[in-house]
């Protein structure tokens, strides 16, 4: 099979000169004009907001009525925009008719409160030995704006939220998700809302390590404090292994013991790093949050009936 | 530092071994050292990756070879140019460089691919116990020998020979060798010792000892 | 059956280690079933089994004649045809091995379904990348070379649950006797 | 609808030139899901919107027209979580655009596909995550790779190594020395003595 050698460009093999020049010109114009301005998804033809909301109610298996979902999805900036448009259109502020829908601030507050309580309860139930500051740090991380913004954009709220700019800002995304939780709470009840939080916010911890989310500044100090509370002696660190001490790839394995009982060990490039990591490992084993810990039973939290009574 | 980083450091750490080659067979210990240098003793071994460990071999001067391997085995260096074809017997090589014998054994046990050079660079051989301090500090484990260290005859105490059980009785009329050979020793005058004629050409590499060293075939070495 | 506790391995079916040409110390002497020490082992392992909260279990599963080591919350990919669609929950029958950080139970060849339950849910069914196979037959006039393109259907399954439903089979009878 | 085996796929624009056959160089990814899908108690279908552009007259969209006439209602009722838009475009080729929750879009031309194949493509969009056609670097994905602890060179080593000073005397012998001939003879001798005395 003889293949002709032809000139080629990113547009494919060069067949006609005029076509190549035409395409090159188009390409240059495009670069001058710059990227297309961002547009609202609702500006396109194939867009029907009611159908989208209807689908959204069915997507997560929550039975919501469309109106509450519409409220959850409208942002304060959207209302401001409407009022501004009306004043420009000459309507006085007084006789502007009240809108059928309201913005989602209150629902967001409700939702955030529900999520916070539930997360504290769930984490405290599954990691009883974990200190309170750690649980607060984890809930703060889970309810932080960036995490919640990722979650809500992953749930498809990016196009559903009604706001003044095409792509909603993280604050709008977080308000929308919390408002969604609030609307679930209104429609079907708190337990259903908590199951939603468990399924989408708590599962964010799946790939993450609890002990790294809660950054402990001085692990050895915390370890001594914890051991005193348990009535054990202060921790001592011993060198268990040292290979290649004078070489570049040096490895020290340091173990932490209290009264000759093993607490934890870890490796490090230098003795100080190894000791610090050993202290963290000891903390991890004391709080029982290391790898061999079972995973959080996201769907069985209620079946175990442990959260209801609290 | 994250837990998984500490775990990775521990898993891929380079362990330093010490090997006491006194009385050990270089071939058998060479296999073990080659395996450790390549890292095949680790479950995380992967041919592309260099997961090998470092080995410090000491006392290579006191390596033990089987039978008359010192005399009969030789290091064959074949080069295309003339006069560089050498057959150095191991005892001569040992005089030149006491660490070379073990080094060559490990080299032969390694598969001859491109990373062999780098794996061999992780082998440190020392003729005696004298090891630099910064190397002996790195050591964290020791490779065990591959053979039972025999007891030399002159180490035997008379008590051992007495307590050793008598297997059978010598017949009465047996005569042990009672010939006193020192009487028949004759000091060879220097002029009688055959001089080494300088031979060029094909024999040059082979003819450098006054006794015949059949490197290829196994023959009795005639020492006069 | 072979139960290994941490470092000490109890080889119930004692076999002489053929490979080692030196006398291997027997870990467990022959009439082992009713010995007191092994009873404690059985009870200890069964207690570990009941303690569901703190033990992350892992299992070795055979799916589409491939064996996979799975824990909960991890995703395995089955290559060829797989009937269940997205959202279907599956229970894996061929479980070869179950274990946690303290014990490992090895089935010969598979474990009793009443003892172990491994469940998963189908997350995604996609097509793999376009794979090409090049075929060349010399001295053929019409078609000497052929490119054969295809895409395999892939199924992603997330393991949702690994549970031990009862004490280890074979250990409770001997303790009750 | 179950996805039966489709090994030979006549991809609409599958020309050899566009196919990149060097395995190492093709773009590859690890397995991942959106938002830990499937971990909690529910599974969220990732397809949000489905737009079908069809021409009422042209022969190329005959399959698409059949599908819309016969299967569209059943499909919409079965999957209420997917919004389906049908766009009649005069004298244009039929297309299928799937928009996913995370914002990805997938475009599949349906020209000359019959009703069964259109149905197959729609269900392949339905069950996808949004970005197919990646080479998988690994066939599985785990967040907790090891439960019993990852091997380190120190796991199976006795702990007293750090206390020893090297070169160590008792570490030079063989671990399981074979019984030499002299030891066997001495053992036989002791046994003989024992038998004689007992």
Regions found by a protein language model. Name each.
Chain A
Residues 1-310:
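Double-stranded RNA-binding/processing signature
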């Amino acid at each position: 099979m003889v293949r002709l050698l032809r000139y080629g460009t990113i547009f494919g093999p060069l067949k006609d000169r005029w076509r190549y020049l035409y395409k090159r010109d188009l390409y240059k114009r495009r670069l001058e004009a710059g990227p297309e301005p961002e547009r609202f998804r609702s500006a396109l033809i194939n867009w029907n907001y009611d159908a989208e909301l209807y689908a959204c109610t069915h997507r997560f298996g929550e039975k919501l009525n469309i109106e509450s979902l519409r409220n959850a999805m409208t942002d304060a900036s959207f209302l401001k925009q409407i009022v501004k448009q009306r004043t420009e259109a000459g309507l006085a502020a007084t006789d502007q008719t009240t809108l059928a829908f309201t913005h989602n601030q209150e629902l967001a507050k409700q939702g955030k409160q529900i999520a916070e309580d539930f997360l504290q309860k769930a984490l405290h139930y599954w990691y009883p030995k974990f200190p309170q500051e750690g649980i607060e740090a984890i809930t703060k991380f889970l309810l932080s704006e960036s995490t919640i913004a990722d979650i809500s954009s992953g749930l498809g709220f990016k196009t559903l939220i009604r706001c003044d700019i095409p792509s909603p800002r993280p604050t709008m995304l977080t308000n929308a998700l919390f408002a969604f939780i609030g609307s679930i709470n209104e429609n079907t009840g708190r337990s259903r809302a908590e199951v939603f939080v468990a399924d989408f916010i708590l599962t964010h911890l799946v790939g993450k390590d609890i002990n790294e989310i809660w950054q402990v500044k001085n692990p050895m100090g915390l370890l001594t404090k914890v051991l005193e509370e348990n009535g054990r002696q202060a921790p001592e660190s011993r060198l268990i292994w040292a290979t290649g001490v004078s070489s570049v790839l040096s490895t020290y394995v340091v173990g932490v013991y209290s009264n000759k009982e093993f607490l934890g060990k870890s490796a490090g490039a230098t003795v100080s790093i190894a000791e610090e990591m050993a202290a963290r490992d000891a903390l991890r084993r004391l709080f029982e949050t290391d790898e061999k810990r079972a995973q959080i039973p996201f769907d069985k939290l209620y079946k175990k009936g442990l959260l209801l009574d609290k | 530092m994250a837990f998984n980083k500490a775990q990775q450091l521990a898993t891929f750490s380079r362990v330093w071994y010490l090997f006491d080659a006194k009385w050990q067979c270089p071939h058998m210990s060479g296999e073990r050292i080659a395996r450790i240098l390549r890292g095949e003793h680790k479950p995380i071994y992967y041919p592309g990756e260099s997961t090998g460990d470092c080995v410090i071999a000491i006392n290579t001067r006191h390596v033990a070879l089987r039978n008359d391997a010192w005399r009969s085995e030789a290091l064959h260096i074949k080069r295309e140019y003339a006069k560089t074809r050498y057959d150095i017997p191991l005892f001569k090589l040992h005089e030149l460089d006491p660490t070379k014998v073990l080094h060559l054994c490990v080299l032969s046990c390694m598969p001859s691919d491109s990373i062999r050079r780098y794996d061999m660079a992780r082998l440190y051989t020392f003729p005696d116990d004298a090891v630099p301090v910064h190397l002996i500090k790195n050591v964290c484990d020791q490779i065990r020998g591959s053979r039972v260290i025999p007891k030399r005859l002159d180490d035997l105490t008379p008590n051992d020979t007495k307590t050793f059980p008598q297997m059978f009785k010598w017949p009465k009329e047996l005569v042990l060798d009672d010939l006193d050979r020192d009487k028949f020793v004759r000091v060879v005058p220097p002029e009688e010792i055959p001089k080494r004629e300088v031979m060029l050409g094909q024999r040059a590499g082979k003819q450098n000892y006054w006794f015949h060293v059949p490197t290829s075939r196994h023959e009795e070495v005639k020492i006069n | 059956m072979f139960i290994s506790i941490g470092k000490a391995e109890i080889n119930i079916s004692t076999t002489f280690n053929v490979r080692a040409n030196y006398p291997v110390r027997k870990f467990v002497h022959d009439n082992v079933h009713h010995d007191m020490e092994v009873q404690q082992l059985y009870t200890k392992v069964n207690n570990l089994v009941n303690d569901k909260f703190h033990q992350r279990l892992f299992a070795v599963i055979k799916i589409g004649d491939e064996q996979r080591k799975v824990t909960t919350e991890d995703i395995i990919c089955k290559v060829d045809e797989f009937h269940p669609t997205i959202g279907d929950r599956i229970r894996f029958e061929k479980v070869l091995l179950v274990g946690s950080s303290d014990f490992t139970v090895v089935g010969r060849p598979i474990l009793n379904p009443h003892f172990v339950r491994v469940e998963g849910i189908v997350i995604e069914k996609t097509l793999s990348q376009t794979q090409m196979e090049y075929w060349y037959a010399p001295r053929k006039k019409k078609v000497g070379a052929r490119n054969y393109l295809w895409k395999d259907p892939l199924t992603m399954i997330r393991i949702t649950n690994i549970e031990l439903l009862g004490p280890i089979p074979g250990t409770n009878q001997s303790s009750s006797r | 609808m179950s996805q039966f085996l489709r090994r030979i796929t006549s991809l609409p624009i599958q020309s050899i030139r566009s196919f990149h056959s060097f395995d190492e160089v093709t773009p590859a990814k690890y397995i991942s899901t959106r938002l830990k899908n499937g971990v909690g108690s529910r599974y969220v279908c990732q397809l949000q919107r489905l737009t079908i552009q069809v021409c009422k007259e042209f022969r190329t969209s005959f399959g698409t027209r059949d599908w819309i006439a016969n299967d569209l209602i059943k499909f919409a009722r079965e999957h209420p979580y997917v919004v389906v838009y049908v766009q009649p475009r005069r004298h244009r080729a039929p297309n299928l655009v799937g928009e996913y929750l995370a914002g990805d879009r997938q475009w599949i031309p349906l020209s000359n596909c019959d009703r069964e194949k259109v149905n197959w493509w729609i269900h392949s969009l339905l069950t996808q995550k949004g970005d197919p056609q990646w080479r998988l670097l690994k066939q599985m994905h785990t967040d907790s790779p090891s439960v019993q602890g990852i091997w380190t060179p120190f796991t199976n080593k006795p702990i007293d190594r750090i206390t020893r000073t090297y070169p160590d005397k008792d570490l030079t012998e063989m671990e399981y020395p074979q019984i030499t001939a002299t030891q066997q003879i001495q053992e036989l001798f002791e046994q003989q003595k024992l038998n004689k005395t007992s």
